[in-house]
Amino acid sequence: MKLTELLSDSYNAEEWRNKGYELPQFDIKAVRKNTFENPTWVHFGGGNIFRAFPAAILNDALNTGKYDRGVIVAETFDYEVIDKAYTPYGNLSLLVSLQSSGTIEKKVIASVTEALKADPQFADWKRLTDIFCKPSLQMISFTITEKGYSYNEDDLARGMTPVFALGKVTALLYERYKAGRLPLTVQSMDNCSHNGNKVQAGVFAYAERWAKDGLVPQEFVDYLKDESKITFPWSMIDKITPRPHEKVKALLAADGFEDNDYIETTRHTFTAPFVNAEETQYLVVEDHYTNGRPPLDLGGVLYTTRETVDKVETMKVTTCLNPLHTAMAIFGCLLGYDLISAEIADADIRALVQKIGYIEAMPVVVDPGVLNPYEFIGAFINKRLPNPFMPDTPQRIASDTSQKLSIRFGETIKKYIARGLDKHNLILIPLTLAGYARYLKGIDDVGKPFTPSPDPLLDELQSIVAPLEIGSKKQDFSCLKELYSRKDIFGLDLYEAGLGEQIEAFVKELYAGKGSVRSVLHRYTTTR
């Protein structure tokens, strides 16, 4: 069983279906012909998240029979991905959905019609410029990570031959401008807040510099800033696509599926002809398009307003996901866990995240309307965290904790104060913040040293708690004032907020001796 069999006229579809593979319900060749002649969507970034999510959503839309165009993928960074993960397999891939039950679902993704290397050194660049001149083109999108939107003075100074992704995209947009100032929507699908603004800032930076240097007319800049022509909508995306999993490879091999080799490029991109991803997914998009759009709502995309996208992001970051992750990271490191899926099976940890989410944070949740906050937390705790295929660790999540506490917990505390809510309802959030002072000590609950995760303030904050000793009966905890009054870390002075003394009391309990983290966590999660 090979993916390219599906491009022949005489493959054994029944064999695939009998082994649990969901096959495309559309004419692949017809979709490719339609897309070549009248393309509607180019996506930059051919990595695992693209194949597992945007491409899969379009595949589902095509399966309805209500749409007939695919997506053209363009790679701006690692061109070997095209040569090794797309071309040998006819641009087909296998999506393996990893269920929390430990089972998998398998679906062939056939929505990608072309895979191009987005750089002038390759012949594909001519094809890309032709596509950008097509009136039919509606949207370009990105999954290139937040770092992919970066640019610098050297690249701005290179003129019309930039190296960075957004410079190349701006050059292609200039081709579209010259073709008749054609409309287009520039859509980020990367997991970063206000992502449309990041794309917009980069594109404007290149265009304005080129205009200043006399390389393009000022009218090109005006075209990019005309929202009747070009828009940069926001989106919120949430789906985990880990590296190809050994267990998945073995399960596919047992089926007789031959395209199961791992691929590592010289730039250390890890991929495969298959992509494995968690079952849960969310993509909420600002509906601000200038030339129509592919009907991705047929595949589950939620189209809404910019304000609602922002509310979904706020719900996730301040209440329903990120704070729970950080609470697990702090206590997971202290209790010796190295896998999130194992940690959530701990009754005390499970109670911690459930009660932070449902009892303490939920009273001030931003309800976006398009997603139910209670259902979002439920899916996170019951499906996503326990998934045995997800290799996430508390140590990874604990990275840069000092930069995260303000958004993940400080915002909730601020809302309690602003709304005059009873701060006595806050027990496990203060306990988590107290746990941070215990975590900074770098000694786990059984007395074993561990290395705290990388953090720009780690040395500074560890020096604050340096006078504290675990198990010392008489010690001065006044150093905590220096920590918990830090507005740059917590978003507010926790003493002024009326929580400083409560947090100090928790810290004293957590420093009482070996086993105190477990006993304190158990006591407060069971009595909460």
Report residues per predicted region.
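Substrate/ligand-engaging "lid" and interaction regions
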Residues: 1-44, 48-528
